[in-house]
Amino acid sequence: MVNIRPDEISSIIRKQIEQYNQEVKVVNIGTVLQVGDGIARIYGLDKVMAGELLEFEDGTVGIALNLESDNVGAVLMGDGLNIQEGSSVKATGKIAQIPVSDGYLGRVVNALGRPIDGKGDIPASEYRLIESPAPGIISRRSVYEPMQTGLIAIDAMIPIGRGQRELIIGDRQTGKTAVATDTILNQKGQNVICVYVAIGQKASSIAQVLNTFEERGAMDYTIIVAETADAPATLQYLAPYTGAAIAEYFMYRGKHTLVIYDDLSKQAQAYRQMSLLLRRPPGREAYPGDVFYLHSRLLERAAKLSSQLGEGSMTALPIVETQAGDVSAYIPTNVISITDGQIFLSADLFNAGIRPAINVGISVSRVGSAAQIKAMKQVAGKLKLELAQFAELEAFSQFASDLDKATQNQLARGQRLRELLKQSQAAPLAVEEQVATIYTGVNGYLDVIEVAQVRRFLTELRQYLGTNKPKFGEIIREKKAVTEEAESLLKAAIKEHTEAFLLQEESVGSRS
């Protein structure tokens, strides 16, 4: 038998007494009455707050949304398959927040800020609330810096500024995501941090976007927040707010950010599902009464901050899907009324081969030329007017048999301008290239080129300018205006290239 020394026992007891800590914890606990379809009804939890996080026995987390007289309705951030009726629920006393840091750049995370790209944990420097209040009037200043998308049709006629909210709206398969991803690709070297939020999309579509970003080196300044179509409705509803919280972290540090919500129709559907299961009264199109507030509190977080707050900005490009071009449906009208303009993509234009399929007539930017550099204002003013007149004339000319020479010339010019706006996907243009392209079109230099050859002519002209007249690009970038020197350089380049191009066409024609 082992000898037990009394002094050893007494020292152990003394140590235990010294370390004894009498701490009383008050925990608010409830009982699950009913669970299913991502919703739990809980009895008890008298002191719970709206939006408070709840912890279930199996570790699942929920959010208390409905506070009723005899029970609490909570939405689950998980499948809830292991939650049983009668099990206990703990109120955590916290509301939803996510870790944030510079380490998020180049990563793919879910709506709770957890990495899902298999590259390990992300070190967090601080936590931010998923839903935080938008900056007030005094905290903001008006939008004045351009946010170049790299798409001529947008930068010339529907300009977007840093801190603006511009809706991208259109039917399915009209190139909405392409416009948004091209804008991200164009931010390379512009010191803009991009957040792409994918809500309820196919995993294959998100993988495709990620692949494009990686190939073009865009992941260096981009964060992807993704919740796929098979994710619980709660997480699809939270994803946009998470994206906004990550962007806010950078915005309040004086950086410029761009957030794309792809798309808010799916978020509204997820919220409708949650609300109907919580038995909230349905309104128009079965959406709950506060679906406007769902989007307004998200989009109001986009801002251009005042100089006292560091002049950071958050530009939001929400995407909304329409059914058969119906812009007057509930969600589209809501988001149109919240945003500072919309880019309308038309299925008819897309099918006619006009891509990006932007309907310039319906699209508008409420910030306007305040978000353009002087060089763009100098050349783009004429473009919108000429295209509007062309659209009118084209409709009229279908019924008229003989047209006078002036009308024929105007129609020919319009067709060339329409060609000028066409761009391939993932090929955004620098602002100096856009200025040169538009100048060539509106000043009639394309009138001698066949319509079918316009795109090739312009591509070669841009290459010619960059190689033989690099001074032009430097002037536009530095002075941000078309000076006399820049104009003479551009005119010389157009003249030289046109002569060479027409000679080449003649020789090809004579050979065939």
Swiss-Prot record:
EC annotation from Swiss-Prot or TrEMBL: 7.1.2.2
Keyword Plastid appears in the UniProt entry: yes
Keyword ATP-binding attached: yes
Sites annotated Required for activity: 363
Keywords, comma-separated and alphabetical: ATP synthesis, ATP-binding, CF(1), Chloroplast, Hydrogen ion transport, Ion transport, Membrane, Nucleotide-binding, Plastid, Thylakoid, Translocase, Transport
Cellular compartments annotated: Plastid, Chloroplast thylakoid membrane
List of residues binding ATP: 170-177
Subunit structure: F-type ATPases have 2 components, CF(1) - the catalytic core - and CF(0) - the membrane proton channel. CF(1) has five subunits: alpha(3), beta(3), gamma(1), delta(1), epsilon(1). CF(0) has four main subunits: a, b, b' and c.
Protein task: Produces ATP from ADP in the presence of a proton gradient across the membrane. The alpha chain is a regulatory subunit.
Family the entry assigns: Belongs to the ATPase alpha/beta chains family.
Protein name: ATP synthase subunit alpha, chloroplastic
Species of origin: Staurastrum punctulatum
Gene giving rise to this polypeptide: atpA
